[in-house]
Amino acid sequence: MIKCVCLVEEKNHQLLLVQVRHRDKYYFPGGKIDEGESLVEALQRELKEELRLELAKGELEFIGTIVGEAYPQPNMLTELNGFKVNRAIDWSKVETDHEITDMKWFDINDSENIAPAVNTWIKEFIND
């Protein structure tokens, strides 16, 4: 199982998702946890790498965990440990790193363009 951390930014039934180079589906900003890292440390590192965003530990709040289908690895599962940010961020001014080819808001019902584990998150935590 691939253990990951992710930033879940949701408003008005839309999620902020990113697309990584050479991948079709969009998923939460974040990534794999390196050996010896806490969940928060891993998310801080990933957000700095992907979005050039530096957040203090106190600005991140754990909101839940799901296990879903890994993307793009077939026949693998991923554990997503989700966090939200406890301060306002102007997402239109956030610059992505070279590995991120796109960042945009998706309606939670746009399952065709969203990675499987993100759709699992939506079913578990967002859809009522």
Question: Residue locations for each model-derived region?
Answer:
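Short hydrophobic/aromatic beta-strand or adjacent loop that forms the aromatic wall/cage
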Residues: 2-6, 77-82, 100
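NUDIX/MutT-family hydrolases
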Residues: 82-84, 93-125
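Short secondary-structure boundary/capping segments
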Residues: 7-8, 18, 73-75, 92-97
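Active-site segment of metal-dependent pyrophosphate-handling enzymes
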Residues: 52-90
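Conserved Nudix-box catalytic region and its N-terminal flanking loop in Nudix hydrolases
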Residues: 11-50
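Conserved N-terminal beta-strand and adjoining loop/helix that marks the start
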Residues: 1-15
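Short aromatic/basic micro-patch
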Residues: 27, 77, 105
